[in-house]
Amino acid sequence: MGLPALLASALCTFVLPLLLFLAAIKLWDLYCVSGRDRSCALPLPPGTMGFPFFGETLQMVLQRRKFLQMKRRKYGFIYKTHLFGRPTVRVMGADNVRRILLGEHRLVSVHWPASVRTILGSGCLSNLHDSSHKQRKKVIMRAFSREALECYVPVITEEVGSSLEQWLSCGERGLLVYPEVKRLMFRIAMRILLGCEPQLAGDGDSEQQLVEAFEEMTRNLFSLPIDVPFSGLYRGMKARNLIHARIEQNIRAKICGLRASEAGQGCKDALQLLIEHSWERGERLDMQALKQSSTELLFGGHETTASAATSLITYLGLYPHVLQKVREELKSKGLLCKSNQDNKLDMEILEQLKYIGCVIKETLRLNPPVPGGFRVALKTFELNGYQIPKGWNVIYSICDTHDVAEIFTNKEEFNPDRFMLPHPEDASRFSFIPFGGGLRSCVGKEFAKILLKIFTVELARHCDWQLLNGPPTMKTSPTVYPVDNLPARFTHFHGEI
C-alpha cells in the first residue's frame, strides 16, 4: 500500500471522526445557547455545555470536586453548563445566592432533576409547589416543634448510647464508621419520623434491607433521565419500589392503630400528623402520597444526618484539642463527672452547650451534607450582569458559597472558635447556608441540630477513637461521605481531662 493510500486510510479512521466529533460538540453548544432570551441584551454566563445530550453530567458525577473547582477557577461565581439533561446556570457566593433564595415564586421555583422527581415522586414535600407545599410544610413542622423535640431527646440518647456500646465492643478490630452511623440514623428516623420500630418493618432482616435499598436509591438519585434496564434511573426506581413495599406495611399498621385510638396523647410523629391532617380535611388517604412522603422523610432524616455525624467523628478525631474543649464544656455543665453521666439530657441543657454548637457549625461549613439546591427560572432575570433565561435550571452551590465566603478567614482550617465571634447578621445570613434558606429551607433543621448535639455529647463523654487511615478522601453522591467508609477503633473514655 502506497503512502497516499495510508494517509487516506488514517484520515478516514482517525481525523475525520475527530473532526465530526468536534463539530458535533460545537453544534450542541450552539443549540443550547440558542435557548437564550433574545429580547434581553445581557449575555449568558460564561461556560461550556459539554457533550451532545449528556452535557457535563458524567464529568461532574465522576470528578465532582475536581470538576467544580476547575469550573470555579475558570469562570468565577456564575457559569453555564448542561447537567441532568437541562441547560443550567450554577451560582455561588452570598450575594448571588441571596437573589436566588429570596426570589422563590418571583424569579425561580424549586425544580429538581427529572430523575429525582421520578424516584421520590410528585407527592413529596420537595416537589410540591404553592399552597400544597405551604400546607404540607405546616403539618410536618409540627413534628419539629420545641415540645416535640423535647420528646425526641431520650429516644435519640437511647439509640446513640446503644450504638456506642456496640462500637466499643468491637475492640482492636475496629469498624467502618460511615455504614454504622447510617444504620444508627436510620433507626432514629424510623422511630421518630415514622413512629415505628425498625425491626417491625417486615421480617428480621428488614432494617438492613431497607438501609441497602436506600443506599441504592441514593446512589442513583441524580441520574440521566433514561429509564432502560441497568440505567441509574432504572436501578433507583427498583430500589424505591422495594422501599415503598416495606414502608406500606408500617403505614397500614399505623392507620389501624390510630383508628383503634392506640396512639395516645403523646408526641405525634410526622407520619401520624400527615394521616390525621387528611382525616381532618375529610380527604381519602392517598397511600401513594404517604409512601412518597415517608420515603422522603427517611431519606432526609438519616442520609444527611449520617453524613454530618460521620464528619463530626472525622474532625474530632483529627483535632484532639477541639475534642478537649468539648469535654471541658461538658465538665463545666456537670456532664462529664462519673456521678452525673447517667443524668438525662434535655433541651435546656443542650441549648447551653454553645461550643458544641460551634463545632457542629464548623463541621457543616466545611462538609455540608447537601452540596446545593435546584431551581428553575420562572422568567428571564439578571444576575451579576448576566441573563438567566426563562426555563433554564439554576443550581445554587452551598459548598462553594462556604468556600468563598468573605466573612471567614483561613477557610480551609477547622476552627470552631470562629463561630464564637459575632458576625454581622446580614453578612452571615447567606454566607453559611448548610440548611439552604428562604421559603425552602430544610424543614427538619432544628431536629438535625439537636440530634447532632446529642450525638456529640454522648460520643465525647463515652469514647476515644483513632482514625485508622488518617484524613479521609471525601466524595459527594449525593451527600458527602468518606470514600473508605472511615475505618476507626473506639475505646472507652474514662472521664479524665
Swiss-Prot record:
GO terms for molecular function: all-trans retinoic acid 18-hydroxylase activity; all-trans retinoic acid 4-hydrolase activity; heme binding; iron ion binding; monooxygenase activity; oxidoreductase activity, acting on paired donors, with incorporation or reduction of molecular oxygen, NAD(P)H as one donor, and incorporation of one atom of oxygen; oxygen binding; retinoic acid 4-hydroxylase activity. It comes from the Eukaryota. Pfam families: p450. Transmembrane segments: none annotated. It is found in: Endoplasmic reticulum membrane; Microsome membrane. Its EC number is 1.14.13.-. Induction: By retinoic acid. Expressed in most fetal and adult tissues with highest levels in adult liver, heart, pituitary gland, adrenal gland, placenta and regions of the brain. Expressed at high levels in lung, pancreas, skin and uterus (at protein level). Lower expression level is detected in spleen, kidney, intestine and adipose tissue (at protein level). Belongs to the cytochrome P450 family. This is Cytochrome P450 26A1. It comes from Homo sapiens. The lineage of its organism: Eukaryota, Metazoa, Chordata, Craniata, Vertebrata.
